């Protein structure tokens, strides 16, 4: 496993093809910031910078403080390490099944984007006529303010939402056509948010 910037191994006479001449069964993983080739390949890569480049920063907007922000842990670094572990496992399996060694190229930008894409790009993936629209997952990732601090409140299906309404002593909301079903709650999200905000602050 190496994570030098592109070209360092080659200049040291340790290019993958050279090492495979010495040992054809080697599984070599090359981790870079932005790939072995391309306009950014020479740049240094740091987790916060790749968070910004892959979209994490853009969706960290807190409605109360509407500015972009970082995820405050080394998210992309860790996503890349998991991707590397999976890639190594695949390379070892290929070797076990009779293939020669492998050279696997992995970058922070690729791993970060792959980890971000499913929910981070939810609003831009299924679009057009006939597509059921709803809030992106990250729109719902918000703290709930109460009278003495903040909590994390999450409800999924109708039964959970109806339990929330009853806990707030608002059982009539269970039968309110605006909030009784998931589709209705999506259509009336702003009205529901206003009610919840008022009730949780009591």
For the regions a language model picked out, list residue spans one by one:
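Rossmann-like NAD(P)-binding element
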Residues: 2-10
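A generic structural signal for short
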Residues: 4, 80, 129, 194-199
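Conserved short-loop catalytic and cofactor-binding motifs
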Residues: 7, 37, 76, 180, ...
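Charged, low-complexity surface patches
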Residues: 8, 133, 200-202
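Active-site-adjacent "lid/gating" segments in soluble enzymes
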Residues: 10-151, 155-156, 163
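Aromatic-enriched alpha-helical interface/lid elements that frame and gate functional surfaces
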Residues: 139-202
């Amino acid at each position: 496993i190496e994570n030098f910037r592109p070209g360092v191994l080659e200049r040291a006479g340790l290019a993958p093809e050279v090492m495979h001449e010495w040992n054809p069964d080697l599984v070599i993983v090359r981790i870079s910031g932005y790939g072995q080739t391309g306009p950014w390949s020479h740049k240094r890569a740091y987790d916060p910078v790749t968070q910004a480049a892959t979209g994490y920063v853009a969706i960290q907007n807190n409605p109360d403080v509407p500015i972009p922000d970082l995820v405050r842990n080394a998210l992309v670094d860790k996503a890349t390490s998991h991707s590397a572990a999976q890639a190594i496992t695949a390379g070892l399996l290929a070797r076990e099944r009779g293939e020669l060694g492998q050279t696997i190229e992995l970058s922070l930008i690729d791993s970060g984007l792959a980890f971000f894409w499913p929910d981070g790009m939810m609003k831009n993936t299924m679009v057009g006529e006939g597509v059921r629209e709803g809030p992106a997952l990250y729109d719902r990732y918000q703290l709930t303010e109460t009278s003495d601090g903040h909590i994390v409140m999450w409800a999924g299906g109708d039964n959970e939402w109806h339990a929330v309404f009853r806990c707030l002593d608002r059982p009539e909301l269970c039968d309110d056509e605006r909030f009784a079903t998931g589709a209705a709650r999506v259509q009336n999200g702003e009205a529901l948010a206003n009610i919840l905000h008022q009730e949780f602050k009591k």
